[in-house]
């Protein structure tokens, strides 16, 4: 018999943020590390492609703020989701683990939002 009132899970929301963060970490973050962490210090960019003024102007634009927000928040959710499930897999029971890890991710998301908005 089918239960007419099944218990709903909040896990799909967290899996969605985990998946988005994993994709962002796998595709966008390595490119940014290559560009800003390796090519820029070696002087392999033409002229003032990433001068301070241009980077600041980008960071203060709407698209730049969204990019910075996603660059910080999505890998954060992915990492904390992994930590939550790693603790579960290792049988290390954190009291109210879901609240600890996802709550921390939510708090850091709000802190990041405040930081990005006030650039």
UniProtKB/Swiss-Prot annotation:
Give the UniProt record's GO annotations in the biological process aspect: anaerobic electron transport chain; anaerobic respiration; bacterial-type flagellum assembly; fermentation; fumarate metabolic process
Q: Which GO terms describe its cellular component?
A: fumarate reductase complex; membrane; plasma membrane
Where is it located?
A: Cell inner membrane
Q: Where are the transmembrane segments?
A: 9-35, 61-89, 97-115
Q: Name one GO molecular function term.
A: succinate dehydrogenase activity
Q: Which UniProt keywords apply?
A: Cell inner membrane, Cell membrane, Membrane, Transmembrane, Transmembrane helix
Per the record's keyword annotation, is Repeat included, yes or no?
no
- Keyword field contains Membrane: yes
One Pfam family matching this protein: Fumarate_red_D
How this chain assembles, per its entry, is: Part of an enzyme complex containing four subunits: a flavoprotein (FrdA), an iron-sulfur protein (FrdB), and two hydrophobic anchor proteins (FrdC and FrdD).
Name of the molecule in the record: Fumarate reductase subunit D
